[in-house]
Regions:
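Glycine-rich loop-to-alpha-helix module at the N-terminal edge of alpha/beta enzyme cores
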Residues: 1-66
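Short coil/turn connectors at secondary-structure junctions
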Residues: 7, 34-37, 60-64, 76, ...
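Generic enzyme active-site microenvironment
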Residues: 42, 52, 143, 176-177
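A glycine- and small-aliphatic-rich helix-loop capping segment at beta-alpha/alpha-beta transitions
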Residues: 57-61, 81-90, 159-163
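PLP-dependent aminotransferase-class I/II
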Residues: 72-147
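Catalytic PLP-binding core of fold-type I/II PLP enzymes
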Residues: 136, 154-179
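Glycine-rich, proline-tolerant flexible connector loops at the mouths of alpha/beta enzymes
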Residues: 146-155
Length: 179
């Protein structure tokens, strides 16, 4: 702590410093892409979510999003639109950002789809939404916590995230992991 305090009295993402560059380079080396990777370093998780939402709309030109029930993504207006872990987070701030539809998180402990493979059932539910209520061609991104925290510390079933990735790829939808 003493060594860090001697280097920085205050840090922000407004100006680059050696440690930020080293972190960005390390993240780029770990990223599983075959193309150059850029990092967006910011002050908080909610700010990173806001950045991801803006980038998704900008890149795709699409207005809608899908989030998961039970998720916590922050308390700024965009991220709050995805936060559905407790109503108290949104109380007094309605309406939040339009265009966000929530779907069930595949919860093995409180299954919403009795007798079904929860992961497959949720993917089928999203497909049904695409056909009936939320056209896939209008969805910029789907945002999920790979490990849902406030929603009960839930891991999705094996294969669910890969299935969600495939569904997004099929429709040109970005997939945002907020972890």
């Amino acid at each position: 702590v003493k060594d860090a305090a001697e280097q920085f009295l205050h840090i922000s993402s407004d100006y680059w410093h050696e440690n930020m560059v080293a972190l960005a380079e390390r993240l780029a080396a770990l990223a599983p892409m075959g193309e150059p990777v850029m990092s967006f370093l910011c002050q908080s998780g909610t700010e990173s979510v806001e950045g991801a939402l803006k980038l998704a709309r900008y890149v795709t030109g699409r207005p809608r999003f899908i989030g998961f029930l039970g998720g916590f993504h922050g308390r700024t207006m965009g991220s709050l639109s995805f936060t559905s872990s407790k109503y108290t987070q949104q109380k007094g701030f309605a309406p939040t950002m339009p265009g966000v539809t929530h779907v069930p998180y595949p919860n093995p402990y409180r299954p919403l789809f009795a007798g079904a493979d929860q992961g497959k059932a949720v993917l089928d539910y999203i497909r049904m939404l695409f056909e009936r209520n939320v056209p896939a061609s209008e969805v910029a991104a789907i945002m999920i916590e790979p490990l849902q925290g406030e929603g009960g510390y839930l891991w999705p079933p094996e294969g669910f995230l890969a299935g969600l990735r495939a569904l997004c790829d099929e429709h040109g939808i970005l997939l945002i992991f907020d972890e």
